[in-house]
């Protein structure tokens, strides 16, 4: 959690997006540099062009509920092409590989318990001008990494002060 001295960083992400997989390097670097002083929050922005992105966002929410959200996010983003081919079967397999309750993951995808969270994130993203992923919001300033990730980490660090 943030101690209040640094602005919160929202990481608007889509789990079938190869650019988001690359953006994890920036997230890791920020975590390494700032540790627990920096709050990085995952926000979902599934894109229509990716068939399994909405289910993947729901699965990520379930993984956070089971206490392994960031590990799950990284594991799925490392396999974006496979997600495109295998869909929900991969999402459940990744949960199992990470020691999560895979049966509960499957149930969460079936019963849609996380749909409202994903829908709310997507609606808020549209409202603030998110058009692609990855996008960051740092202290109210939006940085669109979907256009170019060149120099993005440096711009985030500059906004953190």
Model-derived segments and spans:
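Short beta-strand-to-loop junctions in surface cap/lid or active-site-entrance loops
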Residues: 1-5
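Structural alpha/beta surface segment adjacent to cysteine/selenocysteine redox centers
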Residues: 8-96
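C-terminal cap of thioredoxin/glutaredoxin-like
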Residues: 6, 12, 19-32, 93-161
């Amino acid at each position: 959690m943030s101690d209040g001295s640094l602005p919160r960083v929202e990481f608007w992400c889509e789990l079938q997006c190869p650019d988001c997989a690359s953006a994890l390097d920036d997230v890791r670097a920020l975590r390494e540099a700032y540790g627990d002083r920096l709050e990085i929050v995952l926000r979902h922005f599934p894109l229509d062009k990716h068939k399994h992105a909405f289910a993947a966002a729901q699965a990520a929410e379930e993984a956070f509920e089971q206490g392994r959200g960031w590990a799950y996010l990284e594991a799925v983003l490392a396999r974006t092409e496979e997600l495109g081919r295998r869909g929900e079967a991969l999402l459940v397999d990744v949960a199992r590989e990470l020691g999560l309750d895979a049966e509960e993951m499957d149930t969460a995808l079936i019963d849609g318990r996380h749909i409202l969270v994903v829908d709310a994130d997507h609606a808020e993203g549209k409202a603030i001008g998110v058009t692609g992923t990855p996008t960051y919001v740092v202290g109210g300033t939006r940085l669109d990494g979907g256009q170019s990730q060149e120099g993005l980490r440096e711009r985030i660090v500059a906004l953190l002060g």
